[in-house]
Amino acid sequence: MIDVTITSCGRQDLLKQTIQSFLKFADLPINKIYVYEDSGKEGINDHLKVLFPQIEFIEPCPKVGQIKALDCLLSKVSTEYYFTLEDDWTTLSSGFMAQSLDILQSQPNISEVWLRLRNERNGHPVQPSVYRAKSGTKYQLVKTDYRGQWHGTSFGPTLRRLSDYKTLFPNGYAGVTTFNIKEPWTSEMQVGQVYKKAGFKAATLMNGFVKHLGNGRHISS
């Protein structure tokens, strides 16, 4: 069983697409889905609660930022592995969860598995070698030290171990970084530095399973 966490911030049309496509193609049993809504707007998800009664929506006021939202979500996760999403990704096909799990179970030093299309990796290079997990899943490793500061950590669609988070971040992500709406990528970099220092790397599947929906639809402060 896998718990699923989704961060959302006022883009309910995209959130709806994200949830619908994920549910359509999820290929492992889901325990619980949690959505943290950080728009600060009451009632914004009322229509989605009707569409998705199985989802627990967390809707605090005021806004807290993505880092504290993630920490809140992860405090609710009870499964060994969890899948994390943002509100602006569409899932394209099935098989990504089982393949990601194969990699994480085969390689304890891999912290997450990317699902992005090759042209949506923001230029982040991968190592040329192709590896196989225990059940045959092919993957590559995401290069560390890209532009001197990117090590492969992403808050986008990935499967992760809850134990890694609890071990490396005893005070949560908020213990090592804060969310800056003007430079939201900096928190990913700072969290990534912790993973790199501990010897972790990110992997990517050979084929892309998700596509970004949010180009030009940035969250507001």
Regions found by a protein language model. Give the residues of each.
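N-proximal low-complexity "stem/linker" segments adjacent to membrane-targeting elements
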Residues: 1-20
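Short, acidic, metal-binding catalytic loop of nucleotide-sugar glycosyltransferases
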Residues: 21-30
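Short aromatic/hydrophobic "clamp" motif used to bind/position activated sugar donors
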Residues: 82
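Short beta-strand-to-loop element that shapes/binds the nucleotide-sugar donor at the catalytic cleft/hinge
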Residues: 113-128
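A short, glycine-/small-residue-rich helix N-cap motif at loop->alpha-helix starts
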Residues: 61-68, 74, 92
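Conserved donor-nucleotide/metal-binding helix-loop-beta segment in metal-dependent transferases, i.e.
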Residues: 94-115
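C-terminal catalytic/acceptor-binding lobe
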Residues: 17, 150-221
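A conserved acidic beta->alpha catalytic loop
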Residues: 37-45
